[in-house]
Amino acid sequence: MFEASDVMELFPSCLWLHKVSDSSKINEGLMRAVEEMRAAGEGNTRSSGKVWMSPTNLLEYDAFLPLSEFIIPAADQALGFMRYKFDHFYISECWANMNGTGEIHPRHSHPNCFLSGVYYVQTPKGCGAIVFHDPRAQAAVLSPQFEEITLQNSDRHYLQPDEGMLIMFPSWLEH
């Protein structure tokens, strides 16, 4: 019937998943620094009182410099994978979020950025997944029943994080 058949992935949305070496040691120092910032009243708390966000300049603090030691190589790897030509890049912002039980962040993207990332310092039992949404608006015009939900037919992907996990993704990808 066919001489040849193939599947071509068109406009893929890539995630780069990393498990950071010696993350428990790094996480201990990061958590201590975050707790000190929060106790000092730095950052913002949402009206519910269960969500806290640090200032966005964490890499200006010595305690957070270990982050750049693995974020920069991960970004370099992602840019290389996409075959972009670049001489240098920089991290424009870096912040910490702490969510109370049952709290979530509203669906969002990161405008005026190229790559974004999430690093997990703590993932308590029962913590929520990060949810990535299909960026193709027209993909949802018809939703047939599925034999099985796969990456190819779903309009969102739930990724359960682990401590020490770094996820890099295009900044336009809503999560």
Predicted regions and their residues:
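Histidine-centered metal-chelating micro-motifs
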Residues: 103-104, 173-175
